[in-house]
Amino acid sequence: MSNDTSKQSVLFDDLADKVVVARFDQPQASSDGGAVLLKGCDQALGLTAAMAACLEEWRQQAKVRHDLDELLRQRVFAIACGYADANDAARLAHDPIQKLLVGRDAVNGAALASQPTLSRFENAVDSRTLYRMGAALADSVIARHRRRLKGKAKRITIDLDPTDDPTHGAQQLSFFNGHYGNWCYLPVAGFVTFNDEPEQYLVAYVLRPGNAPATLGAIGILKRLMQRLRAAFPRAQLRVRLDGGFACPELFDFLDAQRVKYVIAMGRNNTLKQHAEPLMEVAREMTARSGQTEHVYGECAYSARSWSRERRVVIKAEVVRLHGRLPKENPRFVVTNHTGSPEQVYTKLYCARGEIENRIKELHHGLEIDRTSCTRFQANQLRVLLTAAAYALMQELRLRAGDTCCARSQVSTLRDRLLKLGVWIETSVRRVVLHLPMGTPFADEWRRIARSIGAVPA
């Protein structure tokens, strides 16, 4: 790091009554001072330790400067702090907070790993290790909530949702997807919701080829999650919510065999349209009288030719009216084994899965989980797992903020309010002191969260 302040300074001669000089000359300072909260959240979850335990060392020990667990933590904490690209490693190599998060001495510790070292790490992980790391993510999150709820959840909802991950190079298994209209991967994200809580917790994120059918891997993911959830919450009722891309006979038969409740959207066809027609006629009459969007709910028994048996289908017959446009008919169908009224099943159970879209937006826009620019498919799978781990830490941070104004904040807002704090670091033989700004706007919330993860007044 250069100590030549003449090259690190800028001067403003007309911003105030005095000349204003800005210097980047504080080696013991960082702009991520609040990120120590993430380390506390990680210790509560045991997440990076569990994922690092899945890694197998392949390097010559005499030449190792960065242990595998340090490399993993370096990437996870950097992603959570907003540094999604491995190229950011060069800027963060001497950052005292980033070193502290990894487990090194904040001031005197050796520099963190470089981008080439991190790239070699990403490309050295095999599919077996990736599978174990994905299981470690699910196990850590589920175990955390088993402790929180004392194993007494009444109902647990599993949501799977595919999303597109646009690719812009020659990545392995990148294909053109006609639905999304670009070259991409097609990952699937898995979330669990406990009882009627507002948060959906990420427990799985599996990268898939860009031309993968929506159902690819879905049964395997559900089976593994159900086994873990039943072991952790033996008395909980499991419920599965899926969009129409997952509606296939194999999945319905699997869910029936597992004896779980489900609500799964289904695409319209001529037979279902015929079942919906009486309801659509009522909706047309209602919207003609009111001039507003109207919908009517009903149900029918239906069995496609490929199905093993007849199932209940809830119908939403809707006519949409928008100003300046002709009315648009919009019948919707949901396959379910719930016994509630059609309106309740659709509006209370199925529509609630819309919150999953907000979680996926956080992953894309808050943590850039689609930063999958490695050539190897497995390296990109590792990247999304590390980003998923960073998101799990941010969700734990949000959970700890439950009694503050940050309780429902998006990831980017949490980062700005709680992590992006200027800090000057002082070390001694016995302690590390973080000098944070007295004028921090959310200092009370920060202290409250810190106490929830074990900090005590000093």
Model-derived segments and spans:
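Short amphipathic alpha-helical "interface-anchor" segments enriched in bulky aromatics
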Residues: 41, 89, 343-382, 386, ...
